[in-house]
Regions:
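Glycine/small-residue-rich loop that forms an oxyanion/phosphate-binding "nest" at active or ligand-binding sites
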Residues: 48-95
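Hydrophobic alpha-helical transmembrane segments in multi-pass integral membrane proteins
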Residues: 66-71, 121-127, 161-164, 215-225
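Cytoplasmic-side transmembrane-helix entry/capping segments in multi-pass membrane proteins
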Residues: 49-59, 82-84, 105-115, 145-152, ...
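Small-residue-rich hydrophobic segments that form or flank transmembrane alpha-helices
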Residues: 5-54, 115, 119-122, 129-190
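Transmembrane helix exit motif
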Residues: 37-45, 68, 82-107, 193-194, ...
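Conserved small/polar residues in nucleotide/adenosyl-binding loops
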Residues: 1-3
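Interfacial loop-to-transmembrane junctions
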Residues: 190-213
Length: 225
């Protein structure tokens, strides 16, 4: 996780303080999709080193559509509680076992559920980074493969979310703020790549886990404070 997936984590809580969650999610949907497409394209040469992307992507799209409709129908609190619990377990596991990784066989079995949960969170609350970031991190992929995996999955879930928002009419009257957010979002891509290249593999691991922990804390504060 880095600049590309911190956009909704930072923007949605801030926007939610002055408006409703539906407006916050709609405002961030287009900029978030563009930044992830840009990052995935720039790291596409690492796609052969990834794992489970097809299954995670397909189930993520399905979950994103369902989650977007849940956004206007259900309380977000149960989803946030579940997300916090999963991420807390992972952060504690990493702290106790820094070399923890999941085997290819185990990841294949769990990938459909993880992809579906990621899409549901992306559609329902606009934030799925802590979950999919934790999951991809425990694959321990090479750095650019890690980036390509996460940004591709975010782009797929974000595209499904955007289509569902359009069909549901959630972007009506919100186009201006959504489009205005695109330029500053895309401007962060080179900065994010520069920051990423300054880290060693060990520092990158620690940075990812620290970002996940901070992100889920901010989400909890935004939801329950």
């Amino acid at each position: 996780m880095c600049i590309r997936d911190s956009l909704p984590l930072v923007s949605i809580p801030i926007i939610s303080f002055v408006t409703d969650l539906e407006t916050a999610v709609a405002a961030v949907a287009i900029p978030n999709l563009l930044i992830n497409v840009a990052m995935a394209w720039r790291s596409r040469e690492s796609r052969a080193e990834t794992r489970d992307l097809s299954m995670l992507g397909a189930t993520g799209v399905a979950g994103g559509i369902v989650g977007t409709y849940a956004l206007v129908s259900f309380s977000e609190a149960p989803l946030v509680v579940a997300l916090i619990a999963v991420v807390a377990i992972y952060v504690i596991t990493f702290a106790r076992m820094p070399d923890f990784r999941i085997s290819p066989a185990a990841s294949r079995r769990a990938a459909p559920g993880v992809g579906l949960a990621t899409g549901l969170l992306q559609g329902a609350i606009g934030i799925s980074g802590p979950l999919i970031g934790s999951w991809i991190h425990c694959y321990r992929l090479e750095r650019r493969a890690h980036i390509f995996s996460i940004t591709t999955l975010f782009a797929l879930a974000g595209a499904a979310q955007l289509v569902a928002l359009l069909i549901a009419g959630e972007l009506s009257g919100r186009w201006t703020v959504a489009v205005l957010g695109c330029l500053p979002a895309l401007a962060t891509v080179p900065f994010g790549e520069h920051l990423r290249n300054r880290f060693s593999s060990e520092e990158f691991d620690r940075f990812v886990v620290a970002t996940i922990a901070v992100a889920v804390t901010a989400l909890a504060i935004r939801t329950f404070a």
